[in-house]
Amino acid sequence: MNSSGVEQGVVIAESEPPRGNRSRYAFACAILASMTSIILGYDIGVMSGASIFIKDDLKLSDVQLEILMGILNIYSLVGSGAAGRTSDWLGRRYTIVLAGAFFFCGALLMGFATNYPFIMVGRFVAGIGVGYAMMIAPVYTAEVAPASSRGFLTSFPEIFINIGILLGYVSNYFFSKLPEHLGWRFMLGVGAVPSVFLAIGVLAMPESPRWLVLQGRLGDAFKVLDKTSNTKEEAISRLDDIKRAVGIPDDMTDDVIVVPNKKSAGKGVWKDLLVRPTPSVRHILIACLGIHFAQQASGIDAVVLYSPTIFSKAGLKSKNDQLLATVAVGVVKTLFIVVGTCVVDRFGRRALLLTSMGGMFLSLTALGTSLTVINRNPGQTLKWAIGLAVTTVMTFVATFSIGAGPVTWVYCSEIFPVRLRAQGASLGVMLNRLMSGIIGMTFLSLSKGLTIGGAFLLFAGVAAAAWVFFFTFLPETRGIPLEEMETLFGSYTANKKNNSMSKDNEVVDGQ
């Protein structure tokens, strides 16, 4: 066997590519991995407008419409649950291909649907692709990116989701000019096109270096790390960290090795994650599930999926005005997700989450209040309340996009130990999609039961509770190597306990 590329890399340092080329390579990898997110975002965005025409064309009830809107995320639990095992078996790259194939088939089925059951089959197939895509894109990007730009690059899936949502909104506006029975079919069927570009793009992507190490392919792993790290020395250091995390001795340096205990490496994952986790792993799991729950339970998909309905309740009566205002939501959401992505490595995950959730709480409170005032004054045109409602929808999506939107995926893709990462991330995605499905499938009923203003005040309460959770439970992870996250969470938990014990001792001494 040849000696590892790690040793070779030290010798040929003079041929090291410039740092800018390395950054561009990692940047390109992140973009290609995030293509799945454009497809997902398009589906989310396009349904907000297509639902108006589907309801009229297929004569659906409100309950049927709610199910149609939210069921994609329930179906995605199938993909999310299988994504961890699939990505460990096939690799991160071919799992992305699989997600694209499901998206392609699902979009075609929905575009050619002639009745409600037919379109639900298309939603099921596309939903499986959603589950795969939402887990694998941030995990792949986190494993390829160097620590210095990991937050920025891992935010790409959320950026592309928002670009997809905006494209869906624009598609709604233009295809709404077609006859009713054709317009919504074009809106949904066009979603198959990006899947073709995804399949082509994946051919240019390298495999995740951490997955390659798990397969014993150290030479191939180093080649990827060498192209995506800022320096040759950083690539060597990253490979050494991954080897230690996987349990490979330092003296095993050949290009291809037999990973010790590989056959049993995956057998205890769920036990270590759910049954008998260490204190640090338990903390990591709770943090991941908590942040995913808060992201969706605070009502973002109610706004994304039902923007035309919300604007109708706020006083915008024509469908054209509702769709234009919805396009504005997409523009604001996309612009601020770019802002959040650019500052996540500068200000850190924790600061953005707290700022974001605080802004969401204020926006939801104002939105709920304005909609309540409008609802209690039927027949009156309260311009200030209408203006406040429209404005606070925009500020809500803006504050969401600057923190809770991108940071959720960044944070949860980087905190799990490498052995538990795929399964841990998939659990977070499953909860995220479950909550998104619940919100999507109950918002109209919730609005009838509590009024639409009351529904948003409920979301405001969730945002307030989430802010407290983030403040007390989430440590900062900016700049921390992936292999040191378990130590970070362990020390954070220990420090919390020590501080609590110190306060108790002070109380006892004072008595």
Curated annotation (Swiss-Prot):
Name of the protein described by the UniProt record: Putative polyol transporter 1
Origin: domain of life: Eukaryota
Gene Ontology terms for molecular function: carbohydrate:proton symporter activity
Segments crossing the lipid bilayer: 27-47, 63-83, 94-114, 124-144, 151-171, 186-206, 284-304, 324-344, 351-371, 384-404, 424-444, 454-474
Cited function: Plasma membrane sugar-proton symporter.
Coiled-coil segments on the chain, per record: none
Paired cysteines (S-S): none
PANTHER family from the UniProt entry: POLYOL TRANSPORTER 1-RELATED, SOLUTE CARRIER FAMILY 2, FACILITATED GLUCOSE TRANSPORTER
Family membership noted in the UniProt record: Belongs to the major facilitator superfamily. Sugar transporter (TC 2.A.1.1) family.
InterPro entries, alphabetized: MFS_dom, MFS_sugar_transport-like, MFS_trans_sf, PLT1-6, STP/PLT_plant, Sugar/inositol_transpt, Sugar_transporter_CS
Keywords linked to the UniProt accession: Membrane, Sugar transport, Symport, Transmembrane, Transmembrane helix, Transport
Statement: the UniProt record of this protein carries the keyword Membrane: yes
Keyword Transmembrane helix among UniProt keywords: yes
A UniProt-annotated Pfam family: Sugar_tr
Membrane topology designation: Multi-pass membrane protein
GO CC annotations on file: plasma membrane; pollen tube
Entry's localization field: Membrane
